């Protein structure tokens, strides 16, 4: 299933900047960045549970916010892209 993860982290303190880096790194481990604070994560249910848990453990609920948009398994017909930054194929081969 494709989950769109968005976040807004308060970066006024060093701790906030650390949270931002950790949340971004966690999202990068599960998906691709499509905007500064937006990631597309193509995950199975077990991966989703781990991703959500890691993100919730990193955030400060009094200062930060996370949003999850579930686009499901048939997401290809629900996502359109226009403009700069060619989209990457989430189903394609990833070379590290």
UniProtKB/Swiss-Prot annotation:
Q: What class of enzyme is it?
A: hydrolase
Question: Record's SUPFAM superfamilies?
Answer: TTP0101/SSO1404-like
What is said about its interaction partners and assembly? Answer: Homodimer, forms a heterotetramer with a Cas1 homodimer.
User: By what name is this protein known?
Assistant: CRISPR-associated endoribonuclease Cas2
Q: Which HAMAP family match?
A: Cas2
The record's annotation in InterPro entries points to: CRISPR_associated_Cas2 (IPR021127), Virulence_VapD/CRISPR_Cas2 (IPR019199)
Keywords, comma-separated and alphabetical:
Antiviral defense, Endonuclease, Hydrolase, Magnesium, Metal-binding, Nuclease
Q: Which GO terms describe its molecular function?
A: metal ion binding; RNA endonuclease activity
Q: Which domain of life is it from?
A: Bacteria
Per UniProt, Mg(2+) binds at: 8
CDD domains named among the record's database cross-references: Cas2_I_II_III
Q: What is its EC number?
A: 3.1.-.-
Family listed: Belongs to the CRISPR-associated endoribonuclease Cas2 protein family.
User: What Pfam families does this protein's entry cite?
Assistant: CRISPR_Cas2
The record's gene field reads: cas2
In its UniProt entry, the species of origin is given as Chlorobaculum tepidum (strain ATCC 49652 / DSM 12025 / NBRC 103806 / TLS) (Chlorobium tepidum)
Q: What does it do?
A: CRISPR (clustered regularly interspaced short palindromic repeat), is an adaptive immune system that provides protection against mobile genetic elements (viruses, transposable elements and conjugative plasmids). CRISPR clusters contain sequences complementary to antecedent mobile elements and target invading nucleic acids. CRISPR clusters are transcribed and processed into CRISPR RNA (crRNA). Functions as a ssRNA-specific endoribonuclease. Involved in the integration of spacer DNA into the CRISPR cassette.
Q: Which cofactor does it need?
A: Mg(2+)
GO terms classed as biological process: defense response to virus; maintenance of CRISPR repeat elements
């Amino acid at each position: 299933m494709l989950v769109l993860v968005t976040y807004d982290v308060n970066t006024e303190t060093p701790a906030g900047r650390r949270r931002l880096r950790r949340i971004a790194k966690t999202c990068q481990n599960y998906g691709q960045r499509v905007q500064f604070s937006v990631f597309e994560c193509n995950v199975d249910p077990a991966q989703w549970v781990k991703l959500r848990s890691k993100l919730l453990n990193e955030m400060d609920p009094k200062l930060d916010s996370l949003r999850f948009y579930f686009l499901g398994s048939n997401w290809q017909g629900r996502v359109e892209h226009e403009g700069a930054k060619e989209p990457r194929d989430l189903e394609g081969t990833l070379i590290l």
